Amino acid sequence: MSEQEPAQTPSAPRTRSVSRRRLLTYGRNAAIVAGAALAVPATAASAGAAAPATTAKGSLAKARSAASLDTTLTNVVTSWTGNTFSGATEWVQDFVFNIAVTADGAVYTVSFWDEAGDYAGIYKDGHLIGNCHGANGDAVAVNSTYAYLSVGNGLTRYTLDGTATSLTYAVGSPPAAAAATDTQVVATDRANNRVLVFDAATGAVQHTWTVNQPGSVAIAPSGEIWVVSNITRDTNDGHFWHVDTANPAKILHFSNSGAALAGTISGPSAQWIPTSVAVDANGDLLVGDNGPLRQVHTYTGLSGTPALARSLGQAGGIGAGTPGRVAADKFFGIVGVGGDSAGNVYVAMFEFGTWLRKFSPAGAVVWQLQGSAFVDAADFDPASDGVEIYTKQCHYSMAYTKAPGSDATWRSYTLDSVTYPQDARLFLTGHSHAAASPFLKRLGGRLYMYVTGMYCAHLLIYRMDGEIAKPSGAIFKARWNGDDPTWPPNQPATGQWIWRDLSGNGNFEAGEYVQPGDGSSSPSNCWVWYVDDNGDIWEGGDRNLRRYPLQGFDSQQNPIYTYESMETIALPAPFSVVRRLHYDVAADVMYMVGYTPDQPFDNAHWKECGKVLVRYDKWSTGNTTPTWTLLLPWDTASTIVVTMVSLAFAGDYIFAAGIETRGQVWVWKAADASPVGTWTAGSVIGTIDRSGWVDVPYGISATKRADGDYLVQVEDDLFNKVLLYRWTP
């Protein structure tokens, strides 16, 4: 996957071992064909016959000779989006909270999670070369011989190859930041509002002093210390920095023993957010500012009166020029800065992803890395013939004539946290994965994006305003009580609600919420969210289905949905529970998948889409007689558990993905549910264990191109990417 402005191609990476979480041990050739499907034709369905009662190990397995998915489809090209690398030998980690840079340009990172185990990756020359295993948190520092990273309530010393030593530095709480020379290590203790200076060789505390809300820290060549003050950072998944404009953030100047010195840096404005500081090769101070400017400032004259000498990056960051359009010098989510002995500058960015960039002393990008699709699904702009792809916050343009890995160009970043600070994508991602799966729709000539998450508790609505996805509306099944108790502001005290951006500013304001008359919550154990081509929203599936017909658009071009217009629809036979649906408006065909009395729900497999898929023709006429009924692959006794989690419908085919089956796709004909075959990811991503579980209910999407090819995308959380298949029937 390439960037909007490709830099030089990095040389081949070093050979390295890989640590992975939750890997299943089976070979590349062990494609899953167990759990075959059984189709019941229309004649049986019209006679009132339900799908035959089977068990996962019994009749389903025996039915393979009659309705087999053993055929491995070979005319499939595998590619991916969301990560610079495929995951075959290297990948860009899920998150980054801070960086430190050695004199020779090795970038040490730290974070709180990476699905494949690289919480604290080490990068050099545009490649992942190692990891400091066991580190977890916000602080990282380096000197000429060691790295120092957050572990628990302090720091642990690592060798530069990533090996932990027994030497620790007791901060007393998870440190906010750290800096190091060959003789000293400095850490900031945000819980106790203090700075600590340690002897680098022994871990003994040499000095400590008070700083209000300390953040990042740097040590000048003179040994003097610069500390960001009056800044706080969330401890939840968002890890965002905050300042109080009534008490603006400042960078304070101290002697090595903690005596206050002149030269306080107040920044270019009271709104600045100095998230990170570092000293460059010239002895000047680099400051990562994630306020409205979103730039990296350089301050000179540290021995006297510091002065702002220059700023790297366009003022306004990702909001500059064409808002959202990607350029190497347009920043967002700045969390780390650093410099090497040659004067190069390194910038790390985080808004639920990892972006690392290296710039020459003249400000030209040298290389850049991206990992921005951890537990992300993707969808196609329906008007683009599969060329334009969107995840919840990134937009890619595809060139299918190019080789996998070079066919995707990162076109835009659709989230602007400065213009829309209440955007739900800033509050619903992280470990809860409450914003993960987008649905793209063209309505009234405009592009809209609907987003749900792993637990389907809500549906977010965005209107594409150029390259920015502007918050437009939302439907929540109940009051939201997330990590941030202040979000969303003004929501009702209890019950389900619909929000619409009446003012057009993207903020959740009083008077913009509506509720049903009884103030009730919607049943929580419901997994259906579907937006059809008319813009109608389908929801529910527990005891009934609920349809929200699109009521038009308001003056802000927001789609209008109301409780008054909502329709309740009984579940059709043979279902007792519906977990997913797809309504083809043009063909008037409804597909539903779920459980029946003969194929009941199993709480051990709560995320799955169900065992039974049914097609109903002429749905709008009230017909609920199945055209056909299909028993989906389901084998919980096999070495690799086979259960379906997500389906996609395009052209003449139905596509499905399982949870533990790692990017494998099953294919049936939509007309009669006859089996076509299956495929797994190609060697471009490595062996089959180099792809991960499909962790979200809506983790697969598909479209048919004008040339007859089919494109299928599958969420792949293990190595922070989205799989993209191109299949020629």
Residue spans of the language-model regions?
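N-terminal secretory signal peptides
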Residues: 1-22, 29-45
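Blade-level signature of beta-propeller repeat domains, shared across WD40, Kelch, NHL, RCC1
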Residues: 697-729
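Short, conserved, GDST-rich strand-edge loop motifs in beta-rich repeat architectures
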Residues: 230-246, 460, 480-488, 594-610
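Residue-level detector of Asp-centered blade-edge/turn motifs that repeat once per structural unit
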Residues: 101-104, 142-144, 180-182, 219-222, ...
